[in-house]
Amino acid sequence: MSETHTPEFEPLVVRRQDTELLGAGPDTIALLADASATNGRLGVIRTSLGRGKDGATPHYHRGSAEMFFVLDGRLQVLAGEEVVTAEAGDTLVVPPRTVHAFAAAPGSGADVLIVITPGVERFDYFRLLDRVRRGQADPRDLLAVQERFDTHFVGSDPWQRTRAAV
């Protein structure tokens, strides 16, 4: 008996030279795989942060979990009400609807592979974030697209206390 194997999407290979890179060293975001390339299964980016630099402010995703794999350095991560420090080789998974944020730990840079699942078409979100960083877009523009990119900004006292000490 033979089975028919029909893939949901074509296998994806993203070559370094073909990767869209946002930001400027040492603070960059490499756009690796958006939801449209994986039939909505996942989205993948790689973020590099300079010593003690902030990454994402406190936010949550209604429909997706987010995984952080620290490739190098040390990363502070808000996961709910707790701030943990993850080191190279550590993995942290944040469930949907859980407030989270991340930054390079004080005195350290961080290189992080981030996977969100199910995937959300978010490359345009990161491009907007880059335009805000360069002063080419208003930070309020991010508030206007929270629903579209399932990135909902909130406050976090534990995160503010932790980062104020940096």
Residue ranges, per PLM feature:
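A short, N-terminal "cap"/entry segment at the start of jelly-roll beta-barrel domains
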Residues: 1-43, 135-166
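Hydrophobic small-molecule pocket/channel-lining residues, especially in calycin-type beta-barrels
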Residues: 61, 75, 124, 132, ...
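Glycine- and acidic-residue-biased ligand/ion/polar-headgroup-sensing regions
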Residues: 63-75, 80
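Ligand-binding loop in jelly-roll beta-barrel domains
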Residues: 96-123
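Tight coil/turn sites that cap or link beta-strands
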Residues: 50-53, 89, 97, 107
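A hydrophobic, small-residue-rich beta->alpha segment in the mid-to-C-terminal subdomain
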Residues: 111, 122-136
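Conserved short histidine dyad/triad with adjacent acidic residue
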Residues: 30-32, 45-61
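Short acidic-glycine-tyrosine-enriched beta hairpin
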Residues: 15, 81-99
